[in-house]
Every structure is written in structure tokens, then in C-alpha cells.
Amino acid sequence: MHPNVPAWRLSAAALLLALAALPAAAADKPCNDAGKSIDGVTTWAALAKAMHDYGHCDKGPTAEVFTEAILRVIISGWPKIADAGPILEKDAAFKNWLAKRLSSPDLSPQDTAEIRDLAKASCPKGQDKVCGELLSSVEMGRAISSPDLLLLQPLTPAPAPAKKP
């Protein structure tokens, strides 16, 4: 068919419309299996895969299961924190999603404190970048949930003005 033939234009338009709908349909895995799949996550690779498979379901009860998985991978899996580096470096979408989740004011103060303490005091050798990214995210969340933390007081009082003789 030739592009000037009206039937060709209609066929091309229908094809483009069908192709435009494919990515959206492929990205939307049903959320009814999300909780079960995410609940079994224990590694950084599995967490990244779960985010890609079910990130669109990250709300309501599924968000709670995602939070539990994140905490399980970071806190319980701290000895394997080195596995996070290559994944965070290669997968910007996962890195941004994780930073957003860790900086959420919905994360409990106890959990953010535990992640902060691990990142500050127990960062394995060579993992400074990963620890810094985790620390930065949870600190951002603390600042959002407790804005008074942003009101820093000077460490020493300002010097008194010099007296004129």
C-alpha cells in the first residue's frame, strides 16, 4: 500500500495505537500476587526485581509489605550490603525508588535510627558510597518528619561585641 491511500493511513494509525498500548499493559502485572511475591524478598537482587515487577502496586497494604522487605534486606541482611552497590549503580529507577522509600516520613523512627546506626558505625570496608546513600535517604526522612531538626543551633555563642573605651 502507498502512504497516500486512505486505507494505509487507517492501518498505520491502528498499528500505532496498538503499539502505544503494549508497554502499559506489559508493565501492569496484577497486584493480587504482589504481597506474596514481595514477602519472600531477602536479597538486593530480589528487591530490585520486586520493585520492577510490582512498583506500580506500591500503595496501601502492598506498600507495607514493600517496607518490610526493604527493612529485611537492609537491616537483617546488613552483612550482604556489598550486594547493593552494583545494583544501585546500574539501576537508577531502583535507586530513586529506594531513596524515596527510605526518606518517607512513614518509616518508623526506630527503623530509620537502626539504618542510620548501621550506615554510620558498621559500614563495611569499601562500601562508603552505599552507606552514604542509605544514610542520606534516612536523614532526609528524619528532616521531613521532624522539621525542628533543621533548626540547628550554633555550637558556640556568638562573641559579644567589643566594648568601646
Language-model features: locations:
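Bacterial N-terminal signal peptides that target proteins for export
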Residues: 2-12
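Hydrophobic helical h-region of N-terminal Sec-dependent signal peptides
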Residues: 13-17
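N-terminal signal peptide c-region/cleavage motif recognized by signal peptidases
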Residues: 21-23
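Secretory pathway export signals and precursors
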Residues: 26-27, 53, 119, 127
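N-terminal secretory signal peptides
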Residues: 27-67
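Extended amphipathic alpha-helical repeat scaffolds
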Residues: 43, 51, 87, 154-157
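Extended alpha-helical scaffolding segments
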Residues: 59-149
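Compositionally biased, proline/threonine/alanine/serine-rich low-complexity intrinsically disordered stretches
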Residues: 146-165
